[in-house]
Design a protein with these regions (language model features):
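Bacterial N-terminal signal peptides that target proteins for export
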Residues: 2-14, 23
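C-terminal segment of classical bacterial N-terminal signal peptides
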Residues: 17-28
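Hinge/capping helix and adjacent helix->loop/strand transition within the periplasmic-binding protein
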Residues: 31-38, 63-68, 87-98, 110-203, ...
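Extracytoplasmic "Venus flytrap"
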Residues: 40-57, 78-80, 161-167
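Ligand-binding pocket segment of bilobal, Venus flytrap-like solute-binding proteins
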Residues: 77, 161-260
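C-terminal lobe and pocket-closing loops
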Residues: 218-310, 347, 355-365
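Mature extracytoplasmic/periplasmic domains
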Residues: 234-241, 254, 311, 315-340
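Extracellular/periplasmic bilobal clamshell ligand-binding domains
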Residues: 313, 329-365
Length: 365
């Protein structure tokens, strides 16, 4: 499904555009990490999409960073990823041996003024952005009744394993609300991989995974007829419209399913809020940062490493197989994604805050 030539052309064009828009680094390789170990920290458990993403990039960074250091992925899960982000905020390592990978689950508490947040994105130095997608799926007994809308599935009671309503799970939970589904989230899991395990054990009957985790761990379930995909969240086209995710062109986007489901509206403040957090959580979802104290020389070294990596002929194919069909941004493109990820309109923010209070009793104080 993911091997068609058209989408390979899209990937190549997207990657070419990203590289063309990046900041030129010139001879930035005066910095050298020979003999050193780079810790690539992600604030999640090792079973989810962020782990797959980090483990894809770690060996490539080792190959392309000056001095070919060892790059090791470290996991610091807790408090919906805010614990790891708070830890990173306090780090003073400035020599390039520490990088941090965030996700929408880290961006959302920041956007919503979560009191657990003691980190400031504007203090950090972004060196890569990765867009991604997500797929919602059902067990076979419900999946066989799904025909492009949820009209016949609204009377079902759903259980969903969630990291928390202010994490990246905000996007599916708000989508479920707009669709009119009765979904009871089981809060407290450490990563989306734990949500998938709940689904596999029959403890949850609706789930979603980001693209990398879906390709790795859910596609085998689909092939064994143990799971049925319902929709992807979609992707943004050049004009900012939601279209089908190029990694899953055969799946309807959430917008299509919403339009087909009675009572679900694709206009108004509810839709605007969902789209705003979808953009922050998926179109600009994953970002790699250096601590704020890193020098421009270190930033340039990482930018050059990612530019060289993306320019390799095999990168598009390998990244498609592991991460899906999404551009990787460096330089100016990474900065633009960083701005998208940490920006939300007051109206969308207030809608989400009101919804969190009314449906889950969550207030940001």
């Amino acid at each position: 499904m993911r091997k068609d030539n058209l989408r390979r052309t899209v990937v190549a064009a997207a990657l070419a555009g990203v590289v063309a828009g990046s900041v030129g680094t010139g001879a930035a390789a005066a910095q050298d990490l020979a003999g050193k170990t780079v810790e690539f920290v992600i604030p999640f458990a090792e079973s989810g999409g962020s782990a797959a993403w980090a483990n894809f990039f770690a060996p490539l960074l080792s190959k392309h960073l000056a001095g070919n250091p060892t790059v090791v992925v470290r996991y610091r899960p807790g408090a919906g990823s805010t614990e790891g982000a708070n830890w990173f905020q306090e780090q003073k390592t400035a020599d390039g041996t520490l990088i941090f990978g965030t996700s929408g689950s880290t961006q959302f508490p920041y956007l919503l003024d979560d009191p657990r947040v003691r980190y400031e994105y504007k203090d950090w130095k972004v060196v890569l952005s990765s867009g991604t997608g997500g797929v919602v799926y059902l067990p076979p007994d419900l999946g066989e009744r799904f025909d492009g809308d949820f009209d016949d599935l609204k009377d079902e009671n759903y259980l969903y394993g969630s990291q928390g309503a202010t994490t990246l799970d905000l996007v599916p939970l708000l989508a479920f609300k707009l669709l009119g589904l009765q979904v009871d989230p089981v809060f407290g899991i450490e990563g989306r991989g734990d949500g998938r395990l709940m689904f596999e054990r029959g403890e949850a009957n609706i789930d979603y995974q980001t693209t990398s985790a879906y390709l790795k761990s859910v596609v085998p379930l689909v092939e064994q007829k143990l799971a049925v995909p319902a929709f992807s969240y979609g992707a943004l086209d050049a004009d900012g419209n939601i279209v089908r995710d190029p990694t899953f062109p055969d799946l309807p986007s959430f917008k299509e399913v919403c339009e087909a489901t009675e009572g679900c509206e694709t206009s108004g403040v509810g839709w605007d809020a969902w789209k705003a957090f979808f953009v922050s959580g998926f179109a600009a979802q994953k970002l790699i940062y250096l601590p704020g104290g890193a020098s421009q020389e270190v930033v340039d070294m990482y930018t050059k490493a990612f530019e060289d990596m993306i320019a390799q002929p095999e990168f598009a194919k390998n990244s498609e197989e592991t991460l899906g069909v999404y551009p990787q941004g460096v330089g100016k493109a990474a900065m633009a994604a960083h701005e998208q990820a940490i920006t939300v309109t007051p109206e969308a923010k207030q809608y989400v805050l009101d919804w969190l209070k009314e449906d889950y009793g969550i207030t940001m104080q």
